[in-house]
Swiss-Prot record:
Expressed in roots, leaves, stems, flowers, siliques and pollen. This is CRIB domain-containing protein RIC2. It comes from Arabidopsis thaliana. Keywords: Cell membrane, Growth regulation, Membrane. GO terms for cellular component: plasma membrane. GO terms for biological process: pollen tube growth. Residues 71-84 form the CRIB domain. The gene is RIC2. Interacts with ARAC11/ROP1.
């Protein structure tokens, strides 16, 4: 016992505003050297809970990676038409009736 009357044989002494006191445990101190079945079961359950979190995080990461991979798809796009006029501007005949701007002057020549 220490000077406040608390038992310090197991080294587990707590204190409050009134002084030190020994924490009550549900362990059987004589038969199993401080081992408690409920503490062991609690530790096993806690380890299973923490172990299952690894799989949950892994599933979330794979979903995020799949979402990242889908950005930019589809890559096999077939272009069916072009906006504007096909070919180069030097090959056009500006006197043609199919030319949409035949009424306007191009490069300073009069039609």
């Amino acid at each position: 016992m220490d000077r406040n009357g608390a038992n310090m044989l197991d080294g587990r002494v707590e204190s409050d505003a009134k002084g030190s006191f020994r924490k009550d445990y549900t362990k059987m101190e004589n038969n199993n050297n401080g081992a408690n079945i409920s503490d062991g079961i609690y530790r096993i359950i806690r380890s299973f809970k923490s172990f299952s979190h690894f799989f949950i995080r892994y599933e979330e990461e794979t979903k995020e990676r799949e979402a990242e991979m889908e950005i930019g798809f589809p890559t096999d796009v077939k272009h069916l038409s072009h906006i504007g006029v096909d070919g180069t501007m030097t090959t056009f005949d500006n006197t043609s009736s199919s030319f949409p701007f035949s009424g306007f002057h191009l490069t300073g020549t009069v039609v």
